[in-house]
């Protein structure tokens, strides 16, 4: 098949492309590399800096459009698939829809269904937008609500979801937002991870537990990494002889990986039920995820044996307690590392995931 993957989130599309190519398909990835993370892509559509950046990008995309025709499948990472206002994306989507056979919409991150469901229906005990029945009031959550609810982004998302042949959800959280609305065409497929040639199940340092945390620019409070970082710093102060903390902020993907490499554990998103791409990549290397590991995460994967993730509730106290237990009981680390590697191999190996996508795409032909 000839497959076009548009947009990027945390290397999902590039990793999927690598798997699909291994299966013999012709794949083109068009993206901006997920901004400063600079993930690989075949065709770069980064927005130039400056006041005229939007117009320059729009001109480049219109020049590219004739090359983006005649594909068997076009998959969009998100309704905002280029760095343009939603109003500009309506005609581009319609063009790509008209000149290609089938359209797949990815439910992999921020969009109207995610914002609206978590704000109004609240099916999750906690999320980026709610803690129980209470709405979160931090600046990022409010900004996203204003950005998506009752706007052209909402209209674009609804159009693309309704018009798409299928919708693929990458995490449990997104599945519960789309499946009730589109039960017949929503398909859950786990995120793809390329397993490293060598994974480490031993301790990185015999004397100290090495804990890694990555900080996203401007999204620390929204993702809960501010709380996790505070707990980790307090524990480092208390257990300086037992723990080393590594903090990475705003790094390109290649540098992020290097800094993460020699860690025993990674602190990830506080308000998540599930591990996303960065913690899954860490787990594939034998790094323990401290973050989202709720029962629903294992249920959607039909995983009844492995429990590698140290699940935390969205509070300072929970993070502090769980991380402290790992520091005080480092004998747990080798088994959790082993389970982490097996978990990713079992559910997220990029070739296994690519075969699931291949089966879905073939069912559309």
PLM regions: where:
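Acceptor-binding helix/loop patch of EC 2.4 sugar-transfer enzymes
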Residues: 39-42, 46, 105-150, 218, ...
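Membrane-proximal helix-turn-helix segments that form the acceptor-binding/catalytic region
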Residues: 65-69, 92-98, 102, 128-166
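A short, active-site helix/loop in glycosyltransferases that binds the activated sugar's phosphate group
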Residues: 114-115, 145-186, 230, 357
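Conserved donor-binding/catalytic core segment of Leloir-type glycosyltransferases
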Residues: 185-223, 229
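Acidic donor-binding loop of glycosyltransferase active sites
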Residues: 261-274, 287
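Short hydrophobic beta-strand element within catalytic cores of glycosyltransferases
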Residues: 288-295
């Amino acid at each position: 098949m000839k497959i076009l993957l548009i947009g990027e989130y945390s290397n999902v599309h590039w990793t999927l492309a690598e798997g699909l190519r291994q299966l013999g398909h012709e794949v083109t990835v068009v993206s901006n590399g997920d901004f400063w993370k600079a993930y690989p892509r075949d065709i770069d559509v980064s927005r130039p800096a400056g006041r005229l950046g939007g117009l320059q990008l729009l001109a480049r995309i219109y020049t590219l459009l004739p090359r983006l025709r005649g594909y068997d499948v076009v998959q969009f990472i998100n309704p905002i698939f280029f760095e343009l206002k939603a109003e500009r994306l309506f005609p581009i989507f319609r063009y790509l829809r008209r000149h290609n056979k089938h359209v797949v919409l990815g439910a992999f991150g921020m969009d109207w269904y995610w914002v609206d469901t978590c704000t109004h229906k609240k099916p999750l005990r906690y999320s980026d937008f709610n803690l129980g029945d209470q709405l979160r009031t931090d600046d990022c959550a409010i900004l996203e609500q204003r950005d998506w609810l009752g706007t052209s982004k909402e209209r674009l998302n609804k159009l693309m979801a309704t018009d798409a042949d299928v919708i693929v959800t990458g995490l449990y959280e997104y599945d519960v937002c789309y499946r009730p609305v589109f039960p017949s065409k929503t398909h859950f497929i786990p995120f793809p991870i390329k397993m490293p040639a060598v994974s480490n199940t031993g301790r990185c340092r015999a004397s100290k537990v090495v804990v890694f945390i990555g900080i996203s620019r401007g999204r620390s409070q929204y993702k809960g990494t501010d709380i996790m970082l505070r707990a980790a710093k307090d524990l480092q102060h208390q257990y300086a002889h037992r723990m080393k903390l590594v903090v990475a902020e705003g790094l390109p993907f290649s540098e992020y990986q290097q800094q993460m490499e020699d860690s025993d554990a990674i602190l990830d998103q506080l308000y998540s039920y599930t591990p996303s791409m960065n913690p899954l990549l860490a787990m594939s290397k034998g790094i323990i995820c401290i973050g989202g590991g709720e029962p629903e995460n294992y249920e959607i994967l039909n995983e009844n044996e492995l429990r590698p993730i140290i699940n935390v509730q969205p509070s300072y106290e929970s993070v502090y307690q769980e991380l402290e237990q790992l520091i005080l009981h480092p004998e747990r680390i080798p088994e959790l590392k082993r389970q982490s590697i097996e978990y990713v191999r079992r559910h997220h190996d990029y070739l296994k995931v690519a075969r699931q996508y291949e089966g879905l795409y073939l069912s559309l032909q």
